[in-house]
Structure formats: structure tokens, C-alpha cells
């Protein structure tokens, strides 16, 4: 199977609805030629603080962003990889950085919670401690796109080769690494 892929590169605002409105025409344009459209980590919003993150994270079972992305996948009849959304788990109220793959019918067929948290001082005067905000995932995920198996990861997972070896051993044909690096850490990658 041949799969045409489009990667949308943009920086989300701090407002999920505004970000998703902004990318609608980008998805429509990409869908004219691509079968799989990939969005970055933090696909719907970026928070300026832990308090804002906690306030704006959507419940995993009632996410307006998930509903909108499902509708866009369905409308354009494409696979749509939301690099990640910041969601609140129902069972324990913890936040997760979750990648989601929507099928052309709008159903979520795979979800992956980022395993490796970015806890670092990167040299820009900032300190990043994702583990203070997010619960880490524990399970590698491969999504079935028919003839193609897609291995999911997010951003800082990139630093941990064992994850990609496992995904490859388990049959992944494509490895995705949606990311929202800082300016300093992005230049290093």
C-alpha cells in the first residue's frame, strides 16, 4: 500500500477552539492529496503555565477538540493523527499528553500516552518538568491502517531508542514523532 502523508507544522495558541479553527483550512487543503494528515504535539493549545494547563485540559470523555478533529477526519475522509492533546483522565483526574489517531470515519482507533516526560534544563534559562503536570504512559502503541502499521510516540520519546526498537520489532512500518520542542531544544534535534 502507498500512503500519502501531510505534516502540518504550526504553533497552537492558548485557545483550543481558535487553534482548531485556524487549522481547518490547512486540513482541507492537505486532504486533497494526503491520506494521512499529521498534526504536532500540543495540536490544540499550548499553555503558558501549569495553572493554565490544568484549567484548559479537556476531559478525555468529553473533549471538544477530539469531537472537532473526529468531524474533520470524517468530513475529509482521511486518517488524522493528532500529535497530542492535553487531556484529563476520568479515573484519577490526572493529565496526560495523548496522541490520537482518527480513522476516516472519525473513530479514534489508537491512543498513546507519552511515556518519557521532558524534565530538563535546556540552556534558555527555563526549566521544564513535564512530570510535574502529566502522568506518564507505559505502553507502546501501534495503530493498524490496513496494510500499514503506524508506531506512535511523542516528542521527548525521541531520546529513547528502545521504544523505537520495540515498535519496529512489533511490526511498525511508520514511526511518528510529533513534537513541540522549545527553540533551544529543537535546534539540538
Predicted regions and their residues:
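Active-site catalytic loop in hydrolytic enzyme cores
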Residues: 90-170, 178-189
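Structural motif
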Residues: 35-36, 150, 174
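His/acidic metal-ligating clusters that form di-metal
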Residues: 30, 167, 173
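Short, acidic/polar
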Residues: 18-27, 158-165
Amino acid at each position: 500500500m502507498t500512503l500519502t502523508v501531510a505534516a502540518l507544522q504550526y504553533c497552537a495558541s492558548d485557545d483550543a477552539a481558535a487553534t482548531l479553527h485556524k487549522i481547518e483550512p490547512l486540513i482541507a487543503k492537505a486532504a486533497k492529496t494526503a491520506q494521512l494528515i499529521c498534526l504536532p504535539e500540543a495540536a490544540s493549545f499550548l499553555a503558558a503555565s501549569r495553572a493554565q494547563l490544568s484549567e484548559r485540559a479537556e476531559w478525555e470523555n468529553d473533549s471538544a477538540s477530539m469531537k472537532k478533529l473526529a468531524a474533520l477526519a470524517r468530513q475529509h475522509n482521511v486518517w488524522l493523527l493528532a500529535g497530542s492533546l492535553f487531556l484529563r483522565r476520568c479515573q484519577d483526574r490526572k493529565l496526560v499528553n495523548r496522541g490520537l489517531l482518527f480513522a476516516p470515519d472519525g473513530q479514534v482507533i489508537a491512543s498513546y500516552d507519552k511515556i518519557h516526560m521532558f524534565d530538563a534544563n535546556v540552556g534558555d534559562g527555563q526549566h521544564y518538568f513535564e512530570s510535574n503536570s502529566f502522568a506518564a504512559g507505559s505502553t507502546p502503541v501501534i495503530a493498524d491502517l490496513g496494510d500499514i502499521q503506524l508506531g506512535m510516540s511523542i516528542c521527548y520519546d525521541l531520546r529513547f531508542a528502545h521504544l523505537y526498537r520495540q515498535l519496529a520489532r512489533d511490526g511498525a512500518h511508520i514511526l511518528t514523532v510529533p513534537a513541540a520542542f522549545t527553540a533551544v531544544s529543537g535546534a539540538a534535534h
